[in-house]
Structure formats: structure tokens, C-alpha cells
């Protein structure tokens, strides 16, 4: 079987309610602002506390203050909520706090989701919005240095590595049009191609991730092939035509060669060869079919049409995740696969399914808040990411936070 039913739960039968969804987003935004403190920012949720952080309030995009502020700004810019409080002074402090927290972990400090590049993007945008152009220029220079310094990062994945800082360069290029960001993207793409080599374990190219003291060839969006491909697909217009053609062929080949099929369904093991027997059949954004869809849905190539549809069908058949509601390994992240296929195919059935996942994800958030006595203030694992997803279901917008074009 291509998924483990014990990791999933039945989809709720509450019908789509746009007014209720809008109210839920507004309530979360109000709660986030009312529970914020300058000293402690937002508390780390027990589900996010681990050996590296304990209950230390985190600064980064992934599950820290920068991510919550990013989500509030995003929702306000979409006019889903009223303009939030001014967090500019807080944002200016986050980089130093993040360096102090993450530098001892040994993965560098320049990553997008876990490192300082995501914080710098937020700081830059807020500085421009406030008209603080000298600050914005200094932050942009620091971001450019960080992107350049992250080239060749051994993790070769989205949380720490250069594929994610390629997304940062693309965002800055989309915002500013400056050539240096395109140059940084192309330099990283060149380095990625050199590392994307024919694998002994599969008839295709794969990257080898050097992370957590292990070397492994991972396939998913969070830590492997799919996530890396997403940056190249997003920035394909900045590459020479022959270079992009080679990339497109290789991406299509690897997606098919690593897929497991069962009739109309498709999924991927987290790594090649599988690390477990039997293999873990995960269905999450970070590992498995949902992240493959969100990462490759922007690939303008009919050779993946049927494969992506099969991956989305698997995501729908598996149902919501028991783990929770968030983006990385929760119901909302899986729902983005359905939204992406709606945007790619135009088939309204996928939007209906995405909205069903949205209703379930909101209920999961509320249930977890009641269980723990606090909201999960984390963009990629908690409520603000769900709020962004729910808004996407209202607006028909499939843009994934931090990894798709922003305003």
C-alpha cells in the first residue's frame, strides 16, 4: 500500500463555509497579536519543543517569530485581516537572536527557513514598506552575502541549503529587478547541476544530502529532490534555454524513476534506497506525494501531468494527517497539493477537495489549542500556516509561503 492508514484520520464532514473560514483567520490574527510580548515573542509550542530548542522562543521563519509576522503581513496584504501591529523593531532584533540560537547546531546560519535569509527578506520588505530605504539597502546587501555564502551548502535541501536561498534570490529579483539576484540564482543552479549526478540506486540523477550526520539521497520537498527542483522551476526564465531544457528532462526523469505506482495513485519513499524495511510510506509536504505536487506543479511539461494527478489522488485518498494541521507535515501542507493541482489543471474538483482539507485543518488547530491550552504560533508547523492555506482556499491562490512569488 502506498500510504499508512494509521498516520491519517477520516476527513470531517463539515461543509465548506467561507464566512466561517474568514472568521477563523481573523480570530487567529487577533489572538496572535494579543498573546505577543516583546521579550518572549510567542511561546514555543510543546509539539515544536525539542532537544535543540527546548521551550526557547524561536526567531526564524520555519517555527519562529519571523514566520508568524510574515503570515500576518501576508494576510493583511491580501486584505484577509486588518493591518497588524508594527513589529518592525522586533524584526530588527531577530537575526542576532537566530544566530545565537542556531549557530551551535552546525548547519550554518544563512538558510531561508531555519537561518537568517528568511529573516532578512522579512526585514527588507518591512523596511521598504516603512520607507526606511537605507536600512533596506543594508539588509539587501547582507542577504546577498548570505545567499552567496550558502552556495555549496552540503545539506542540498530547503531548510538550510542553497536551494532555499535560491528562492530568496528569486524573491528579491522579483521585487527589485536587480541583476545581482539573477546572477546569484544562476551560480547556485550551476553548483546544483554539478551535484545532481547519476545514482547507483535508481535510473536517474539524485542529490546526496549531508545532514544530521548522515548522507542520504532524499526525494521529498523538505529535504530532497522535489524541493530543489522547485527553485529551478520557479527561476527557469533566468536560465539559458538549453540549460533549462537539460534541467527539465532530468527533473521529469527523476520524478518518474523514483515514483511508486499503484493503479491511479503515486507516492515516493523518503529516500533512495529506503532506510526502513518495510519503507515508511509518508504522505506529507516534507516527504511524499504532496510535496512532489507542490514542487513540480509549476513545471510546464505535459510529461508530468498524469504523475502529478496520481500523486494528488493519493494525497486525497490518504486523507488528513493525524500529526496535525500544519504545512510541513500536516493537513494544510497536503491540502496545498490539491490547490496546486487546481491551479495547474483548472479542474474545480481539486478546489473543492482543498477546501474540505481546510475545514478539517481549522478543526485540528482548535482541538490542539484546547488540548495544550495555547495556539501553535509557527508558520510551517502550526496555525499561521493554516491561516495562509485557508485564505488560499478562499481566494483560489495556491502560492506556498516563502517558496512562491510574493507581493
PLM-predicted stretches and their roles:
Residues 1-31, 234, 238, 298, ...:
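Terminal, non-catalytic domain-edge segments
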Residues 23-41, 85-105, 134-152, 184-204, ...:
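Long, well-ordered core segments of solenoidal/helical folds
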Residues 1-17, 66-81, 118-130, 166-178, ...:
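Well-ordered alpha-helical scaffold segments within catalytic/enzyme domains
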Residues 1-65, 70-74, 78-92, 183-202:
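Low-complexity, Ser/Thr/Pro/Gly-enriched N-terminal "stalk/linker" regions
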Residues 73, 80-220, 226:
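Extended ligand-binding groove/face enriched in aromatic
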Residues 180-305:
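Extended ligand-binding clefts on enzyme/binding-domain cores
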Residues 43-65, 98-116, 148-162, 210-226, ...:
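Solvent-exposed loop and edge beta-strand segments that line ligand/cofactor-binding
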Residues 315-350, 357:
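Loop/turn-rich, solvent-exposed surfaces of beta-rich toroidal or solenoidal domains
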Amino acid at each position: 500500500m502506498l500510504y499508512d492508514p494509521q498516520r491519517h484520520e477520516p476527513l470531517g464532514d463539515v461543509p465548506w463555509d467561507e464566512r466561517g473560514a474568514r472568521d477563523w483567520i481573523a480570530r487567529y490574527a487577533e489572538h496572535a497579536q494579543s498573546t505577543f510580548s516583546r521579550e518572549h515573542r510567542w511561546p514555543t509550542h510543546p509539539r515544536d519543543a525539542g532537544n535543540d530548542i527546548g521551550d526557547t522562543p524561536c526567531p526564524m521563519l520555519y517555527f519562529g517569530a519571523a514566520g508568524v509576522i510574515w503570515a500576518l503581513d501576508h494576510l493583511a496584504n491580501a486584505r484577509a485581516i486588518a493591518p497588524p501591529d508594527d513589529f518592525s523593531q522586533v524584526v530588527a532584533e531577530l537575526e542576532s537572536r537566530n544566530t545565537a540560537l542556531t549557530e551551535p547546531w552546525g548547519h550554518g546560519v544563512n538558510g531561508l527557513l531555519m537561518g537568517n535569509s528568511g529573516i532578512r527578506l522579512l526585514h527588507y520588505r518591512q523596511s521598504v514598506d516603512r520607507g526606511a530605504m537605507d536600512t533596506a539597502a543594508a539588509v539587501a546587501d547582507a542577504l546577498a552575502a548570505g545567499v552567496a555564502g550558502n552556495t555549496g551548502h552540503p545539506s542540498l535541501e530547503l531548510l538550510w541549503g542553497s536551494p532555499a536561498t535560491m528562492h530568496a534570490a528569486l524573491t528579491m529579483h522579483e521585487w527589485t529587478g536587480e541583476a545581482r539576484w539573477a546572477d546569484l540564482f544562476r551560480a547556485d543552479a550551476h553548483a546544483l547541476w554539478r551535484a545532481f549526478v547519476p545514482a547507483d540506486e535508481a535510473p536517474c540523477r539524485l542529490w546526496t544530502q549531508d545532514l544530521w550526520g548522515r548522507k542520504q539521497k532524499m526525494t521529498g520537498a523538505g529535504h530532497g529532490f522535489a524541493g530543489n527542483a522547485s527553485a529551478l522551476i520557479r527561476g527557469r526564465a533566468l536560465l539559458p534555454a538549453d540549460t533549462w531544457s537539460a534541467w527539465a528532462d532530468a527533473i521529469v526523469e527523476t520524478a518518474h524513476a523514483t515514483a511508486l505506482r499503484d493503479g491511479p495513485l503515486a507516492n515516493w519513499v523518503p529516500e533512495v534506497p529506503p532506510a526502513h524495511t518495510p519503507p515508511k510510506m509518508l504522505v506529507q509536504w516534507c516527504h511524499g506525494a504532496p510535496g512532489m505536487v507542490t514542487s513540480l506543479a509549476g513545471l510546464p511539461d505535459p510529461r508530468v501531468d498524469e504523475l502529478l494527478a496520481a500523486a494528488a489522488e493519493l494525497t486525497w485518498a490518504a486523507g488528513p494527517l493525524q500529526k496535525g494541521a500544519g504545512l510541513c507535515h500536516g493537513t494544510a501542507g497536503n491540502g496545498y497539493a490539491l490547490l496546486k493541482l487546481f491551479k495547474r489543471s483548472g479542474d474545480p474538483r481539486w478546489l473543492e477537495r482543498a477546501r474540505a482539507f481546510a475545514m478539517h485543518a481549522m478543526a485540528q488547530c482548535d482541538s490542539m489549542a484546547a488540548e495544550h491550552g495555547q495556539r501553535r504560533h509557527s508558520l510551517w508547523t502550526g496555525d499561521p500556516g493554516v491561516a495562509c492555506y485557508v485564505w488560499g482556499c478562499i481566494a483560489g491562490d495556491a502560492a506556498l509561503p516563502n517558496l512562491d512569488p510574493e507581493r
